[in-house]
Structures are given as structure tokens and as C-alpha cells.
Amino acid sequence: LLVQRRSTDRIQSLPKKMEVNFELNYSQKRALNEIDISFEKKEVCLVHGVTSSGKTQLYIKQIEKFVSEGKQVLYLLPEITLTAQIIRRLQLYFGGNIAIYHSKFNNNERIEIWNKIKTGELKIILGARSALFLPFKNLGLIVVDEEHDPSFKQQDPAPRYNARDAAVFYASLFNAKVLMGSATPSLESYYNAQKNKYTLVTLK
């Protein structure tokens, strides 16, 4: 009887990184510079830009920066199943360096991705609100895309929380930064920006 042990990677297979180059326009370059300056002084930056204004490109540039510094990045989306276009764009740009995490994983898949995040092997995690509970080793940045979306709030089952607000607290444990974005910022986030708690960057 021959017994063999075979290693199986259960994490969702992603395409290899493709050469996807893009040039930022003047407004994007200005906004990116404002984000960099903001992170020197504050933990949270809110990007207000209309749909198709180029917020995703700003997220990609910031992700690149933090990963190059050896940090891990968590990219939060309100609903994984409804954001296929953004996921595809990130996959094409980062390839196998990014992993998707969601509540439909079975136990074996959860354990595998959990361990790879805990050891720091995985650098970029894309997920819905439940991804906040992953055991990051060296978290540097949390991106909260469409921060106004009510899907970030969990009512039932417990625990009840807003992933957007929880992200700010979780980031503080790592001395990490939070980059929020929306075409229609939530009242709470806009208020925090007006009170100078967050930095507000407008992308036109």
C-alpha cells in the first residue's frame, strides 16, 4: 500500500499578473499627492469622486506603495458578488499577489487562507466585511470602497457592527492607514472630514 501526501492549494486560483500600465491624469496625480501628505499626519483619508473619476487607480497606487514596503493590504468591498468588474481589474494588475476571501469558503479554504495571512505570505486580501476578522501579521492599509454602502453593516447574526467604522479601529491596532472612497460619502464620514478627523480629498 503506497501512501502519498499531496499539497493542494484551496485558495481561489487567480491569473498571473499582466502588464497593465496606466497614466494618472492631472486630477488623479493631485489627489494621490494629497493622500500621501494626508497619511503623514492622519490615519484616515476620504476620497470623494464621482463614478468613473478614477478612484480605483488611486487605490491601486496606494496598494503598490504599501506592498513595496512589506505591508499587507485589506481591500473591503460591500458585496463581492456585485463588484466583478473591480475584482477583475485588481486581479489583472496584481495577479497571484491578491486573494479573495468571502463567507462562502468551506472550512478547509478558510484555514488555508487564514494561515497564509497569519504568516504574511498573502499580501493583498480582497473581501467583504467578514475579512476584517482575518489574522493579519503586518497590516499597513485598509481600503474601504463605496464606504457609504449599507451592506457594510451587519445586523444579524451577532456581532452587530459597521465594517467601515470597525476598519478604522482595527487599523489603529497596527498603526495602519485607512483609505475610504465614495461618489456619495456617508453623512458620518463627511462629518468626520469636516471636523478635521479625516482628510477629505476631492477627485474631479
Residue ranges and their predicted role:
Residues 1-77:
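Pre-Walker A segment
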Residues 39, 133-140:
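Short basic/glycine-enriched coil/helix segment immediately N-terminal to the Walker B
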Residues 66-73, 95-97, 197-201:
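Post-Walker A helix-loop "phosphate-sensing" segment adjacent to the P-loop in P-loop NTPases
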Residues 72-84, 103, 203-204:
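Short beta-strand-centered segment that lines the nucleotide-binding/catalytic pocket of NTP-utilizing
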Residues 89-97, 101-125, 136-139:
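Conserved motor-coupling elements within RecA-like helicase/translocase cores
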Residues 127, 144-145:
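Hydrophobic residues in beta-strands of the RecA-like P-loop NTPase core, especially within AAA+ ATPase
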